[in-house]
């Protein structure tokens, strides 16, 4: 066996570089943090070949004198801290003093820097961590660092880099996060010779609209909270802006971009049922707190932080988001284009094919982490709709017995000025479209309701209330129905048997794995008793395997989904009115228990625009 030997410094540097510099985006992150710490108010990011060939960061920060510049490329040399106690009061983004040493050891590295008043800039060129050239060149105050041929001397690491599209995507997403986090800084980005953006003003709305599409900033919900412990400010997105990934969730703690599972989960749970399964809301949130209450020295790439009291942070953060979510009408706006998921806009030059970027696979663990908070949560809202909501929604407060239907509408040949929209309206106009949607005339235009998901919402909240009060609302069957369950279904039945009784099912055992249905909830359609029970068990099992739902919440969702009015079912006028009245008596009429929208509204102004009247 070979004896133990100390590794040469050049080898040790390459090994340690693997912790800090994992891919081109790691280089960009470290250099951007240094530029911000240097007090720059103008930063340029220039990359070539997705960062494999070139990463150059140019800033107009304070610059460095010669001795400091040489020390900056040495391991564990930094201006940010002097002792371990400084880690408890850290205000800078960088602090370890190993980034430049790690980067220079695996690349062709050039540093140019100049301080205020210096006639010339200093230039230092390194290859594999070794200084090979020093010179004085023309240059302005600030620092420019060029990293070429990344991992040229570590072929194993270079071989495992992903496609240009993937590596470029990581870089773009990182730069975007800094651009949004630091609106006081002017940002420029150039990729393969093409300028992607150049923000010269601190207008955050301009940046949001550029990255996510025109009008995006106006659709966001502001978040503001401040106390002696923590300050929270920023924006969250409407449910219609949700994504299948969390790349558009930005958490900045004391200006540091971090990843934190607790914050992501609390954000997800605050939205509750407004989110479709496995979707994540947009968030751009800034936290300010005493640096001594957080530990940033957790992850080599400084991507994670540890809170001194994580529970207190969550208990402050969750209600803030919950209040913001509840304070807005989240029914989708048809003309705003909210219904389709809003795709992130990646300006890209022709050589890079973004269609090659695959969505990250969703693991079972992520599904459990991303579960939506159900109605049985102790923190769920108990408030009803705002006072006077229905009076504002429908033109007349009470519909009369007579109803003018589609025939009358089709037969009216008057112009728009003859359409009564004020006090002259004598009834609520309701039509069923293709036995699928309900169309209602409202003061501002029209409202479209999905009859299936609307009934789901009604049944879900009824089930929740019934099981919480333990007062079953059951109707007895004249002829009991017999159901034989498969072994795996029987196990589910045994698990939810007591809650089925609370829901209104009166069940008795009849031999091995056989159940007699003697009574059902009053909402169950006659003749569907057996299929409803079987479908509920199947739905409950599927939800349990995919999502982390509380047992009663899962049962209520399964019951409402399987028992709701189906698409294609014709409704009478009275049934439509009853459904709408029941919907707006629920706590949350805007989405079904699974997160799909229930209501879409169109204003007269939007219709006028579509018909060229405006």
Curated annotation (Swiss-Prot):
One GO-annotated biological process of the protein: mismatch repair
GO molecular function: ATP binding; ATP hydrolysis activity; ATP-dependent DNA damage sensor activity; mismatched DNA binding
CDD domains reported for this sequence: HATPase_MutL-MLH-PMS-like, MutL_Trans
CC annotations in GO: mismatch repair complex
UniProt entry keywords in alphabetical sequence: DNA damage, DNA repair
Taxonomy, superkingdom: Bacteria
S-S bonds: none
One Pfam family cited in the UniProt record for this chain: HATPase_c_3
Gene3D superfamilies for the chain: 3.30.230.10, Histidine kinase-like ATPase, C-terminal domain, MutL, C-terminal domain, dimerisation subdomain, MutL, C-terminal domain, regulatory subdomain
InterPro entries, alphabetized: DNA_mismatch_repair_CS, DNA_mismatch_repair_MutL, DNA_mismatch_S5_2-like, HATPase_C_sf, MutL/Mlh/PMS, MutL/Mlh/Pms-like, MutL_C, MutL_C_dimsub
SMART domains from the UniProt entry: DNA_mis_repair (SM01340), MutL_C (SM00853)
Role this protein plays: This protein is involved in the repair of mismatches in DNA. It is required for dam-dependent methyl-directed DNA mismatch repair. May act as a 'molecular matchmaker', a protein that promotes the formation of a stable complex between two or more DNA-binding proteins in an ATP-dependent manner without itself being part of a final effector complex.
Family to which the UniProt record says this protein belongs: Belongs to the DNA mismatch repair MutL/HexB family.
Name of the featured protein: DNA mismatch repair protein MutL
Organism: Chlorobium phaeovibrioides (strain DSM 265 / 1930)
